[in-house]
Amino acid sequence: MLCVAGARLKRELDATATVLANRQDESEQSRKRLIEQSREFKKNTPEDLRKQVAPLLKSFQGEIDALSKRSKEAEAAFLNVYKRLIDVPDPVPALDLGQQLQLKVQRLHDIETENQKLRETLEEYNKEFAEVKNQEVTIKALKEKIREYEQTLKNQAETIALEKEQKLQNDFAEKERKLQETQMSTTSKLEEAEHKVQSLQTALEKTRTELFDLKTKYDEETTAKADEIEMIMTDLERANQRAEVAQREAETLREQLSSANHSLQLASQIQKAPDVEQAIEVLTRSSLEVELAAKEREIAQLVEDVQRLQASLTKLRENSASQISQLEQQLSAKNSTLKQLEEKLKGQADYEEVKKELNILKSMEFAPSEGAGTQDAAKPLEVLLLEKNRSLQSENAALRISNSDLSGSARRKGKDQPESRRPGSLPAPPPSQLPRNPGEQASNTNGTHQFSPAGLSQDFFSSSLASPSLPLASTGKFALNSLLQRQLMQSFYSKAMQEAGSTSMIFSTGPYSTNSISSQSPLQQSPDVNGMAPSPSQSESAGSVSEGEEMDTAEIARQVKEQLIKHNIGQRIFGHYVLGLSQGSVSEILARPKPWNKLTVRGKEPFHKMKQFLSDEQNILALRSIQGRQRENPGQSLNRLFQEVPKRRNGSEGNITTRIRASETGSDEAIKSILEQAKRELQVQKTAEPAQPSSASGSGNSDDAIRSILQQARREMEAQQAALDPALKQAPLSQSDITILTPKLLSTSPMPTVSSYPPLAISLKKPSAAPEAGASALPNPPALKKEAQDAPGLDPQGAADCAQGVLRQVKNEVGRSGAWKDHWWSAVQPERRNAASSEEAKAEETGGGKEKGSGGSGGGSQPRAERSQLQGPSSSEYWKEWPSAESPYSQSSELSLTGASRSETPQNSPLPSSPIVPMSKPTKPSVPPLTPEQYEVYMYQEVDTIELTRQVKEKLAKNGICQRIFGEKVLGLSQGSVSDMLSRPKPWSKLTQKGREPFIRMQLWLNGELGQGVLPVQGQQQGPVLHSVTSLQDPLQQGCVSSESTPKTSASCSPAPESPMSSSESVKSLTELVQQPCPPIEASKDSKPPEPSDPPASDSQPTTPLPLSGHSALSIQELVAMSPELDTYGITKRVKEVLTDNNLGQRLFGETILGLTQGSVSDLLARPKPWHKLSLKGREPFVRMQLWLNDPNNVEKLMDMKRMEKKAYMKRRHSSVSDSQPCEPPSVGTEYSQGASPQPQHQLKKPRVVLAPEEKEALKRAYQQKPYPSPKTIEDLATQLNLKTSTVINWFHNYRSRIRRELFIEEIQAGSQGQAGASDSPSARSGRAAPSSEGDSCDGVEATEGPGSADTEEPKSQGEAEREEVPRPAEQTEPPPSGTPGPDDARDDDHEGGPVEGPGPLPSPASATATAAPAAPEDAATSAAAAPGEGPAAPSSAPPPSNSSSSSAPRRPSSLQSLFGLPEAAGARDSRDNPLRKKKAANLNSIIHRLEKAASREEPIEWEF
């Protein structure tokens, strides 16, 4: 009731207030009329009458004055009361509270009466109880009954126990039988293993004998060749001798010829001699010539013979050299296979003992469970332990339940069901299924061609199946499980290998279609090693898919979805590894499978693969382990590991095990990788032991066995490394070469590999969890092979040759070697691979060892690093090129590569001085995967997601944890996803399994089982580096999370000018920002230096952004290196908002804050790259922007810069105008623009175009008629005004953008300020749309538009108070002559330029033309008061009330402020203001404003009498 009465009272008060205001206006009008009438009376009446009436009129006037004074005081008192009433809080809550208290009091009375009644009943019960006590007879009877019941219960228990005992005995007998069966199977397997060892030994002996034969053949051939060469050499010598003899003869003949010539001359002299002598001479001469020609022919023939002999000799040399190299290659290949076999035997020396121990342990500890048969042989120890534990628990529970059988039979069912369900969730893969369909498992792409393992080498299968990429259950839990199964599979496959015979052929051409080698042209034309025919193209062979076999696609899709959900495998992983398709395609296929008959050949492929995938449990488990590892290491993206999509599609089979193998060479590497994996899993197990004591209970013996294996392996590897050390010392390989070599070797794997063995040197000290590519897949053309295999032993020269050969190969192959080539080499030529692998492994060890010495962890970086290193750039160039570190080892290689050249470029290199600082890209949120137990606990319960998210939000708020950290550390999600999930949680029933996982994680986090590292711990700082990282993270994070903290200066903000930050101060404030998580405003204000006395004082400032020199130059780069991942899109968005809100230019911001040109800033803000794609240099601007956004005084500092630039510009303009030198160099301005401009300082700026007032008027009139003029109009205007067309175009463009900007600022302020639109009458609002109202003020308070309106003064945006324009009075509608500019034009020249031709601030808004009668006094005053902080209030257009309006302007804002407070205060006091309230407030504001104006108005006119 009271609330209604209050509302009514307020309405009445509003009404009375409006009435008062209206009356006030009326009294004003009547008063004016009275004054007019009194004047007329004074003029018209005779003087004597005036004298008689004067005292009466004066008394009337006095009375009227008194009355008006009284009414004003009364109105003032009313206003005071009214204001207080408006501020009175709502009494409704207090009344509600009173009512509640009253209800409570009534309830208390009721409770008291109830208590009284209860006491009475209690007394009655006490009496009854006393009576009952006396009845001992009944008690005796009850005791007898109890005895009888106990007797019956005992009998029942005994009978049940007897039955149970019988059942247990039967079970025991059954289990014993099964145990015997398993023992039989293990003995058979042991025999198989012995067979395998024998076959290996025979194979070894055979290869040895073959090797010896080859050696003898090689020796024979070499001796034969040597003999041939000797013979050829002797022939050559003979030929040379003959040639020399011929030359000698030729010389003698030449001598004879010269003598003959001489004799001829003599003969010619003796002409008078007889004819006989002449005839003789002629004869002798002709015979000499014939002889000479014959000799010359002989010489030519001899020269040809010599050349022919030399050619044949070179040919022979080349042939023999090639044959020798081939023989050497064969020899080295045989040597390497021999070595591998020996190492394999060594490695498997204690294999039998371990196997025996494990089998004994199994047979002693665990009797096999029901319904398994041979499958149980494959079950690892932990699974058996768990099953035994469960069976014992269930038996125990069953006994307990049977004891309490009388009371609760229902409870037993409840316990049995989950017990029976659990073992099913962890199925052990039976390897006994493997031999049944080996061909089906390895079927090729099309799903039909059988690929028999009989034709493959044992290395192929042992490496593919024993590689650590197939942990058969989630990590840590089943270390022994995975080890045992791998070894069992290895034994089976190597047994299968025996059938292929021990010939040197690795692939037989028969049993499988050539199409299984996914080779594409150009290599298709070349037959492979064993003369196998080139395969037909993919498209031809794809037609051979069996069309007859129908499949139920819907059923297959359903089964796949079930398996994926059951094992928590994502569709992306499934699509990637099994189908070779994207996540979207997989989702489409599984959601809407087409019927079989409607599918194309290509469309049927995925279903073949899915069927193959479902056919074997191994595939599913392998994929599950990959999924688990992906969740552990989400930073390594799939794209990085597997870039060859077409290759993957060609070679993909439904059987996952053939696709996930690493291309390792030889079983020795495989064994090493098994041991490495076992070691890792043991470590994981140790850490997991406290959490899972039951699983670790019986694994003591097996742990010791595995440890002994590991120690032996380590000893062997240390011995190998010791053998390699001398080679390492002498090998002439620079560190950089090795750094290149290692990544190249590690980055060319052709197969999709998940994890393979790391280089030996790394694996000794630091087992790598990151996936690496195998080293064996490097393409090996003969030239490289020859070099790599020249040294079969471990001589240092050989290692160096190999490394240099690989280097050369890297250089050649960087541009052109394709993935198909890698694949072809890995698939078709495994023996060549094996031959090269030992040398490459050496090279890897070399790389690994040296890198360890230099502080890097050794590993793969990007090919771009290799390229840049080959070309030899400086470290700074190298850093510019460096992509965001994509490889797990890139961090170390960056360190090692740039370590040497750091001294050259201390400033340029963005490396931190300490190698502790992490520099690799911040990984995506990584969280450990949930265990199956955690899933089971919550997955099938109904969880209240709304309540859960509420609790999480409360806990986050209480502990001050931001959503980004929570998302990264607990949920593995981005901040956006977390925010979305917490604000709008879906109901549990509508969530998929993947969607439920975050909520399960939240629940576990609330229970304290997950992500405890997220909670802030006081006083734990790990060294200064980490401290600086966290301190940086806080201000950055503060900026990221709360976008409200962005400073937005309103139109009224115009602080006093201050100088830009000097270099030292800026560094100081930067470091303060970094070290204070929430920078206090006072501290950053202190960092601003006082205003310099004269402009040239800042000459000494360097021209870099936030200038950093010497030590501080590193600080910003260290910040960049240590900064967490930033949201570049969010930062640029907020920067753009702040710049537009405050009318700041990108040029100023770029030069002052970022040290970039306007173009670069514009590009950065328009198209920001994501953080992880940026180099360190590219991240710097974003870190600077973030620091700038976090600085509370950022806008003010830029404003100061802008004002100083403007002042400098104005000075320059004035001086240039006065000296008639329009092209004066802009020396003063450049002092203030802190950015290093691209042009040198002495270059001249273009002069600014300054338009005359009449030109501006004409252009404005043209604009009002047509804001977008046609080219013809532009040309006409240009000719009329004698301007360039470009100037006119620019003026229109600038004018349009200025008006748009004003409207935009106006809207922003109207939205952000409570008092916006204070006098926004509907007519004024409608006037806003009209193009003629350019004079609207920025605050949203316009002059009233009507037939007699004049445009009032227009306040400028911030920082433009110096350029305020005086509005034109109505009389000056015509443009004044150029000689006598109007009052506003004198100043108009200074800032109302035409188009901006050079860099510089945009022209300020122009005043519109004033075309009508004066505005009403109130409106003029209102608009003058609208922008209180923007400089002097402008005089209104109408001359009479101008004094009053200007004098009352300062007073009004304060009264408004006292009534409504400033917008910030209002926002803080009541943030729930809805638009309705705002309108109401604005309306009241206008009424009170008018009343106050009337009350406080000084009398403008005195009484006449």
From Swiss-Prot:
Residues 815-853, 1353-1368, 1384-1394, 1467-1476 have a biased composition (Basic and acidic residues). It is found in: Nucleus. The lineage of its organism: Eukaryota, Metazoa, Chordata, Craniata, Vertebrata. It comes from Homo sapiens. This is Homeobox protein cut-like 1. Residues 56-407 form a coiled coil. GO terms for molecular function: DNA-binding transcription factor activity, RNA polymerase II-specific; RNA polymerase II transcription regulatory region sequence-specific DNA binding; sequence-specific DNA binding; sequence-specific double-stranded DNA binding. Residues 516-546, 694-703, 1050-1066, 1316-1333, 1405-1436, 1443-1455 have a biased composition (Low complexity). Interacts with BANP. Interacts with SATB1 (via DNA-binding domains); the interaction inhibits the attachment of both proteins to DNA. There is a cross-link at K785, K811, K842, K1284 (Glycyl lysine isopeptide (Lys-Gly) (interchain with G-Cter in SUMO2)). The record marks Q643, E644, S747, T748, S749, P750, M751, P752, T753, V754, S755 as: Cleavage. GO terms for biological process: negative regulation of transcription by RNA polymerase II; positive regulation of dendrite morphogenesis; regulation of transcription by RNA polymerase II. SMART domains: CUT, HOX. GO terms for cellular component: chromatin; cytosol; Golgi apparatus; nucleoplasm; nucleus. It comes from the Eukaryota. Residues 396-407, 440-451, 868-877, 887-911, 1036-1049, 1230-1242 have a biased composition (Polar residues). Asn-1290 may participate in regulating DNA-binding activity by promoting homo- and heterodimerization. The modification Phosphoserine is found at S763, S909, S1059, S1069, S1270, S1337, S1455, S1486, S1496. Residues 396-455, 512-552, 646-669, 682-704, 768-802, 815-930, 1036-1110, 1210-1247, 1312-1480 are annotated as: Disordered. Its main location: nucleus.
